[in-house]
Design a protein with these regions (language model features):
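Short, low-complexity Ser/Thr-rich regulatory SLiMs
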Residues: 7, 19-20
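Mg2+-dependent endonuclease catalytic cores in nucleic-acid-processing enzymes, primarily RNase H-like
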Residues: 16, 22-147, 166-170, 176-177, ...
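Two-metal-ion RNase H-like nuclease active-site motif
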Residues: 1-9, 62-63
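Histidine-centered active-site/metal-ligand motif
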Residues: 151
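Short glycine-rich loop/turn motifs
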Residues: 11-15
């Protein structure tokens, strides 16, 4: 299981739970809340992982602002999550433009199968994410509006940015069983296997 997030304390924080499959991802769950710190999120995420039937998490992808220290703990969110999940599990999404992340989201969403029940509020946010239109100039803004929809959308596109490279591609030619092969194909397979013997 892989998790991507957008962090916020006074703002909302959003968390997407991903499962790699051949050709894309099952998006299992979206969770969000506001006013919570890392110490509140860690047990909640661990509980969500258990509820989803996973034994552990492969990676948690966090935005670059996870490196900022807080006044309350004097530690970064990244450090707190590393303590809760392990050093090797926490990664920071590389800095790119929001436009690049949106493009990654547009590309990867075609390869995602969503649990409509557990992702309902996150999907609402993805549908509602929009650019502001300037009537006077007849153009859209360069960046989407920052509102309630930006939290699930940012969390989703952070995940898309790093996960688009890891999509498991289906085999070009599906394997044939012995009863589907011609006699010549069986002889060729046999020759190849014999040549690899010691």
């Amino acid at each position: 299981m892989i998790i991507s997030c957008d962090l916020g304390f006074n703002d909302a924080a959003g968390w997407w739970y991903w499962q790699p499959t051949v050709g894309g991802y099952n998006v299992l769950m979206y969770d969000y809340d506001h006013g919570l710190d890392a110490s509140d999120w860690i047990p909640r995420i661990q509980e969500n992982i258990r509820k989803l039937g996973a034994k552990n998490v492969g990676r948690i992808w966090m935005p670059h602002d996870a490196r900022a220290k807080t006044f309350q703990t004097k530690r970064t969110s990244q450090e707190q999550f590393q303590q809760g999940f392990g050093m090797d599990k926490i990664r920071i999404v590389p800095m790119t433009s929001k436009v690049d992340r949106i493009e990654a989201g547009r590309h990867l969403i075609k390869s995602c199968a969503f649990n409509r029940t557990l992702c309902d509020s996150g999907l609402d946010g993805l549908r509602a994410w929009e650019y502001e239109y300037n009537e006077d100039e007849g153009v859209f803004s360069k960046h989407p509006k920052h509102n309630w929809a930006s939290h699930p959308s940012d969390a989703f596109t952070y995940g898309c940015q790093v996960l688009q490279e890891d999509v498991i591609k289906p085999a070009d030619v599906p394997p044939k069983f012995w009863d589907e092969q011609s006699l010549n194909e069986l002889w060729e397979t046999n020759k190849r296997l014999k040549s690899k013997r010691i």
